[in-house]
UniProtKB/Swiss-Prot annotation:
Biological process annotations from GO: dihydrofolate metabolic process; folic acid metabolic process; one-carbon metabolic process; response to antibiotic; response to methotrexate; tetrahydrofolate biosynthetic process
Family the entry assigns: Belongs to the dihydrofolate reductase family.
Subunit details: Homodimer.
EC number: 1.5.1.3
Record carries keyword Oxidoreductase: yes
Protein name: Dihydrofolate reductase type A13
Gene Ontology CC terms, in alphabetical order: cytosol
Residues annotated as domain DHFR: 7-162
Keywords (A to Z) from UniProt: Antibiotic resistance, Methotrexate resistance, NADP, One-carbon metabolism, Oxidoreductase, Trimethoprim resistance
Pathway given in the UniProt record: Cofactor biosynthesis; tetrahydrofolate biosynthesis; 5,6,7,8-tetrahydrofolate from 7,8-dihydrofolate: step 1/1
PANTHER family: DIHYDROFOLATE REDUCTASE (PTHR48069:SF3)
Catalytic activity: (6S)-5,6,7,8-tetrahydrofolate + NADP(+) = 7,8-dihydrofolate + NADPH + H(+)
Organism whose genome encodes this protein: Escherichia coli
Amino acid sequence: MNPESVRIYLVAAMGANRVIGNGPDIPWKIPGEQKIFRRLTESKVVVMGRKTFESIGKPLPNRHTVVLSRQAGYSAPGCAVVSTLSHVSPSTAEHGKELYVARGAEVYALALPHANGVFLSEVHQTFEGDAFFPVLNAAEFEVVSSETIQGTITYTHSVYARRNG
């Protein structure tokens, strides 16, 4: 993957305890929060792990879905399948120069060192779970915007950008 040619963004929602998933499920349902994801990723390249793809069961509509899997010969109908993040870049050529990483925990951890930015919804509650979002190093990322959304479940949506130097 050539970081100069492709801009990589992580898109995630996590609980106050960094939980992003419990088995194949997202442990919350927040009206409006999924709209942020759709707005950011529509008509873009979206990378997800195999387990996330299997929990959804189909490609994301109006997106070029790439599934990252270590399983040789893995097939995901309607999606590109790659074994490493470095193989994702060629699949972005006809879909623009932005790539959005959208679950799971291992994929986030692999992509974070290459990320230009992070779109993160932080839910103001703790949840049971077995998948966690990696810690963002304040020396590497800075908050460029943040908005708290009050509702049945309160969350803060923040945009982080990689610091230069």
